[in-house]
C-alpha cells in the first residue's frame, strides 16, 4: 500500500527491506531497523555442539550488538547527519544511558526519559 501512495517514505523493520521498496526508478525505504542475529545463532549452535546449552528466554539489546540499522551506501537514503545521530543514539543505548520503554523493564512510554 505504501508504494502506491505518492511521496511516501518508510523505514523497514527486522531485516534490510530496501529491495522491497523498489518503486519504478525510486525507492520508498529510507533505511531498515535490524535484528542482528548471526552472532547469537552462531554462539547458541556452538553451545549445543559442546553440550553447554542451557535453554532460556533471553532479551537481546543494543548492548549485545543485537540491533542495528542499514547505513550502507546505495541501500540507505539517510543523510550523513542522520546516520551520525542514529549512531550516537545507538551508543547511548549500548551504554544504558537511554532505556527504551519495554514490556520487560517497567519503563513505559509515559515514564521514558533520557
Residue map of PLM features:
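A residue-level marker of the well-folded mature domains of exported/periplasmic proteins
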Residues: 1-114
Amino acid at each position: 500500500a505504501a508504494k502506491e501512495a505518492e511521496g511516501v517514505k518508510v523505514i523497514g523493520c527486522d531485516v534490510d527491506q530496501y529491495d522491497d521498496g523498489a518503486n519504478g526508478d525510486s525507492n520508498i525505504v529510507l533505511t531498515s531497523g535490524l535484528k542482528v542475529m548471526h552472532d547469537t545463532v552462531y554462539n547458541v549452535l556452538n553451545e549445543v555442539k559442546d553440550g553447554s546449552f542451557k535453554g532460556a528466554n533471553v532479551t537481546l539489546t543494543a548492548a549485545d550488538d543485537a540491533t542495528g540499522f542499514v547505513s550502507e551506501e546505495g541501500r540507505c537514503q539517510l543523510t550523513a547527519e542522520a546516520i551520525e545521530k542514529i549512531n550516537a543514539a545507538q551508543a547511548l543505548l549500548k551504554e544504558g544511558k537511554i532505556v527504551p520503554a519495554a514490556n520487560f523493564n517497567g519503563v513505559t512510554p509515559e515514564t521514558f526519559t533520557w
